């Protein structure tokens, strides 16, 4: 016999977990995750930096709102999720100007070297600084969302890969692992697998494209000072930041991939180490660990949050690209407001409870329109 819920969320990464914690208590919620552990793929492989100056305008707006929501929650946690950590962009005058936004201020060459003495002076000619950027304790944030969701009555089921889904009356019938579910709303928060979930559900896919993003923790001869900013090349060729006594580095590659358990490819990190040892005095010695995540994007590079145009009760929460953590709380707030308002499928008694969850971002807002799954620019 199928278990019934108002909302069933497919995907246990930061998107699905943050939505589960936003919805639970206002309606009945289940979250199913294909892997045996939550946040296994992209969310556990994040750079853990929230950058208001990063991404398109709507992403920057979502980031500011996410930081507000996380800061409010920090006061209720035993340790903070957010830690101030500036973000510095370096490169040519032209490239820095092209990548900078209103959240970033230009700084002098000398000031950039003061902030990050490891930089070789001749390696860049211009720099910009975002002092509103924060480091993120991703494991703590994920755990808090799970605890809040479960405390409010949500059921979280791991090792339950969705293998079937179809419309049933006014809702959905979903098979995941050995379990059967019925739900008024099905939320597709499956990351790199979001298009596959759509196809399984008989819904037209959006043409979402996963891209590889590799990172590594390296041992260095000269560790970065404690207050060092995260440093990124304006030409998107690398970034690095302090990770305790070590340094986190990334080649910032944009290589298309299928949905998979991605792994570093031979040469990616080695080539980056050669480059960083030319533009910094870090003296990278050994690779302690390396990993590859998948960041999945829509054709226009903007995340997707909204009901499908043709499939009632099918809600897209996908395509976050490299902005997953920094937009997560704001996108969950928006999605909860739309779902609880009963768009696409009624939730009975729960439908009136969504006004507080989504008050800051009304479903008819400009932000909602920019993220809508019905927008013309989304499909490839």
Sequence positions of predicted segments:
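N-terminal Rossmann-like FAD-binding beta1-loop-alpha1 element of flavoenzymes
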Residues: 5-30
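Helical element adjacent to the flavin cofactor pocket in flavoenzyme catalytic cores
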Residues: 132-180
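C-terminal catalytic lobe of FAD-dependent flavoproteins
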Residues: 278-380
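Short hydrophobic core segments
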Residues: 8-10, 181-193, 332
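Glycine-rich FAD pyrophosphate-binding loop
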Residues: 24-43
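Helix-loop-beta segment of a Rossmann-like dinucleotide-binding subdomain
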Residues: 78-89, 106-152, 252-259, 312, ...
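Dinucleotide-binding Rossmann-like beta1-alpha1 core, especially the glycine-rich loop
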Residues: 47-118, 122-126, 237-239
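Active-site substrate-recognition segment that forms the wall
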Residues: 21-22, 48-50, 78-83, 190-313
């Amino acid at each position: 016999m199928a278990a019934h819920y108002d909302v069933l969320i497919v995907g246990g990464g930061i998107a699905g977990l943050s939505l589960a914690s936003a919805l639970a208590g206002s309606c009945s919620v289940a979250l199913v995750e294909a892997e045996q552990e939550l946040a296994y793929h992209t969310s556990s492989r994040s750079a853990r930096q929230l950058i208001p100056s990063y991404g398109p305008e709507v992403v920057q707006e979502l980031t500011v709102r996410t930081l507000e929501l996380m800061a409010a929650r920090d006061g209720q946690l035993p340790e903070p999720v957010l830690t101030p950590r500036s973000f510095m962009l370096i490169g040519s005058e032209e490239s820095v100007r092209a990548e900078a936004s209103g959240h970033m201020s230009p700084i002098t060459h000398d000031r950039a070297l003061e902030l990050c003495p490891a930089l070789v002076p001749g390696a860049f000619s211009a720099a910009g600084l975002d002092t509103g950027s924060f480091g993120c304790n991703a494991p703590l944030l994920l755990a808090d969302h799970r605890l809040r969701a479960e405390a409010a009555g949500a059921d979280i089921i791991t090792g339950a890969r969705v293998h079937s889904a179809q419309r049933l009356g006014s809702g959905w019938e979903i098979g995941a692992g050995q379990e059967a579910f019925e739900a008024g709303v099905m939320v597709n928060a499956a990351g790199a697998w979001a298009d596959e979930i759509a196809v399984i559900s008989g819904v037209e896919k959006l043409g979402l494209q996963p891209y590889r993003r590799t990172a590594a923790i390296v041992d260095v001869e000269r560790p970065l000072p404690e207050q060092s900013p995260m440093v990124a090349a304006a030409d998107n060729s690398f970034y690095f930041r302090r990770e305790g006594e070590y340094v986190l580095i990334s080649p910032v590659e944009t290589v298309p991939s299928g949905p998979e358990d991605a792994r570093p490819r031979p040469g990616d990190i080695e080539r980056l180490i050669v480059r960083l040892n030319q533009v910094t005095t870090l003296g990278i010695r050994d690779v302690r660990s390396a990993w590859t995540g998948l960041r999945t994007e829509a054709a226009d590079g903007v995340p997707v949050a909204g009901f499908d145009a043709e499939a009632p009760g099918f809600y897209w929460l996908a395509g976050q690209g490299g902005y997953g953590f920094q937009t997560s709380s704001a996108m969950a707030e928006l999605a909860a407001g739309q779902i609880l308002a009963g768009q696409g499928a009624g939730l009975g008694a729960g439908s009136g409870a969504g006004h507080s969850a989504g008050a800051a971002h009304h479903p008819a807002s400009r932000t909602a329109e920019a993220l809508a799954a019905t927008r013309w620019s989304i499909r490839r």
